[in-house]
Amino acid sequence: MRLHEYEALDIFEQNRIPVPHRGLATTMHEALQVAGEIGYPVMLKAQVLVGGRGLAGGIRTASTPDELKDVAEELLSSDIKGLPVRKILVCEKAEIARELYLGITIDGYSGRPVIVVSTEGGVLIEETAQTAPEKIAAIHIDPSFGYYPYQARSLLRMLGLKQQLIAPWSDVIGQLYDIALRYEALIAEINPLVVLPNGGLLAVDAVLEIDDSALSRIRRSLPDRAERIENPLERRGREIGVTYVDLEGDIGIISSGAGLGMASMDIIGQKMKPANFLETGGGITADLLYKCMQLVMMKPDLRAIFINVYGGINPIHEGAKGVARYIAEHKVKIPIVAKALGNHQEETWEILRAAGVHVVTEAATEKAVEKLYELVGPAK
């Protein structure tokens, strides 16, 4: 679960990380009131759960009340990457002497927390890694021993920093690590961590994403995860009990497991563009597959649907009944390709073929994708 920036900043402030003076606004008048209390100039930042807000016009500056009125009204009537802007964060505009980067995430290979720092803040850390890797340093933390302040100091010395910056920055690293540990964060990030003219530090941006599996263990006031899923298709997926991730392509995907789903996406992505990732979590009932078809078909401009299911204990012919019912009721015109193997597979093939589905009986997902490509051709 990713928190909004204003929520992450509140947590940072509670844990003694210096953050800007700020206030949340849902109307232009509220934004004016907050700015009046803070003092101009101010930053207005759209609060949506996507990255790249700045490039999309979601982070703006206002130096006067009149300018703020225009900017606030424009932001609150806009959307960022398809998500409507309902809240804006109004915060003081910091005087910047230097921009740094600090992030803590989980290394997918070792499973350990890794602290990443860079003297190049305000840009994507991935870009810095490509263009100036010498400006990045990282250290893994062994959970068996925990974090010690000397590790942060050693890390910062690797970047050749002076002592007057190492001391306060190492303090922030320790505070952010405590937050990441306490909230079981997948990522905790400050980008940029600003150096002020007086030498102080200020976290002018905050990212905090909490592992969904940890939510039941965190005894703190956190918003319900469903409330922050702003994409209506992803919200609907959660409502029906499947994992749905909206993508930018035009080939809908339904799978009965994460592995099948990711394999389908990867192979389809070589020549075509997936419209979504959807996995049922193992459930293959008629009602669930009907709802999955309904969900995938909500995406506009689909060219085809690709179904990849396997049933060990689950009888997959029940799911086929749901697919067939949806096709019959909604007169689906686009091609549907299915690879369905396992319990009651022959009966499943008969049901799907009778509904007009292109059934591929080979075990290799590549064969089914080849059939899909024959029907729809390359990505457009």
Predicted regions and their residues:
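ATP-dependent carboxylate/acyl-activation modules
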Residues: 1-190, 194-307, 319, 341-380
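C-terminal hydrophobic structural anchor segments
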Residues: 303-342
